[in-house]
Amino acid sequence: MHHARNVQFSNIHVSTVDEDVRPDFVEVDTKGWGDQGDGTYRNPXSDPDVIRVGNKXYMVASDFHXMGMQVLESDDMVXWRYISQIYRRFNEPGWDANLHYAGGSWAPSIRYHSGLFYVYFCTPDEGLYMSTASNPAGPWAPLHLVKRVAKWEDPCPFWDEDGQAYIGRSQHGAGPIIVHRMSADGKTLLDEGKTVYEGPIAEGTKFMKRNGWYYLIIPEGGVGTGWQTVLRARNIYGPYERRIVLEQGSTGVNGPHQGALVDAPDGSWWFYHFQETPVLGRVVHLQPARWEADWPVIGVDYDKNGIGEPVATWKKPVSSVGTAGFQTCDDSNDALGLHWQWNHNPVDTHWNLTDRKGWLTLKAMPADSLKMVRNMLTQKVVGYQSESTTKVSIKGDSYAGLFCSGKLFCGVGLCKDGVFIEFGGQRKIIDKGSYQEVWFKVTNDCEQNRHLFYYSIDGEHYQPAGSAFAMSGGYWKGIRVGCLTTFLQAKRLLRARHLRMLNSTISIKNSPNSLADC
């Protein structure tokens, strides 16, 4: 069994500077993240979709093999908090055996219609799914399978003024864009769909209508190298006019595309998109937008070629509403904090929060490698520099501790023979001894791509566990950290105490536009 308590993040420390450069700009340290002095953006996500209902904005994003699509809420469109989870397990073959890395939810869409919030997503192998809720904080209805089909992706629903429902989507292999009619409740497709556009790696469909124009807001050109395209037509089936509205240009933001065009309460417009990075994964950015001749203009056209480029910093959409700290699960004995995610489906018979009040219990199960360990509990890395620690004690032949995952799965932990490290499926004892308890730590420097495990016998003096190593994102996700326990033969007992995911102090001179993602 694995006991954990006091799961928490530390606050990011922020200091302000004068906004005296230009009316719309502030000078910032671009290594910082999130809000400027009066709010912090935490734990964002890839392939974002955002809507605004009233004075609040809501975000969903791809979660792939992690359970199970978090919903985030914001008062100012910059600082976000988790408020719910759409599903907690995926009841399809292979999801109880860690067989669907890079599968699961791809590029969801969230919409609000007639008093209900709707979320749609496709999976590579299983089909098109949707769920609804009257309150975005949940509960969300059980997943409804709209169509059993493979290789669809990136769906987005749309309800026209006459009540007719549609859904746009793309196909694996990046296109074409196809539009279907749906039943009014959004649960049934009414036709086989009509192709309305073909383009270079056209995907990520987002529908909207404004001033009588139907818009398809789509990325093209590929994840790491693409651009943002907008299509418009007077008829939902076209013909569509095309315009490129955002590109990398002279900036360092590669592939600035795929996201959501959203208006703020004051009527200003904004565009969320992601940027693929090699270690952190897909990093969310927010661009200013406006309309000219019924075309969206996004970012700033620095080279005057008619196409916007990402800005480094910009005035916030909504004035500050106060700083929000990192979310933890310390304030509840009834549920894990929403920032925690299981890798694939959890085995509910092998974890609980009831064996000891305020503690998490994980029961060890056999696995051939770290990648295949069941009940692997993970969370996103926060920012470029972070630190995570846990305290572990064991009985029997269990292996347990702290791990990092991406393309590589590696970890440090405790077994009956002492402290071990594991890389590439090879487990090595680095400190022999019969320890009752050991503290473990990992530091993640995603800017230098330098990561290092540590261990401590007293919780104060740490020494390296092996050498520094490089990491890269994998299976469409950035690197993650978490805790696990496993055994090779018979069931054993693990006790891990004072588990806490502790973000290191990050001094932010001011708020950049980059919104961190893993």
From Swiss-Prot:
Its EC number is 3.2.1.37. The record marks 154 as: Important for catalytic activity, responsible for pKa modulation of the active site Glu and correct orientation of both the proton donor and substrate. It catalyses: Hydrolysis of (1->4)-beta-D-xylans, to remove successive D-xylose residues from the non-reducing termini. The active site is at 47 (proton acceptor), 203 (proton donor). CDD domains: GH43_FsAxh1-like. InterPro entries: ConA-like_dom_sf, GH43_C2, Glyco_hydro_43, Glyco_hydro_beta-prop_sf, Glycosyl_Hydrlase_43. Keywords: Carbohydrate metabolism, Glycosidase, Hydrolase. SUPFAM superfamilies: Arabinanase/levansucrase/invertase, Concanavalin A-like lectins/glucanases. One of its GO terms (biological process) is carbohydrate metabolic process. It is an enzyme of class 3 (hydrolase). One of its GO terms (molecular function) is xylan 1,4-beta-xylosidase activity. Belongs to the glycosyl hydrolase 43 family. This is Putative beta-xylosidase. It comes from Xylanibacter ruminicola (Prevotella ruminicola). The lineage of its organism: Bacteria, Pseudomonadati, Bacteroidota, Bacteroidia, Bacteroidales.
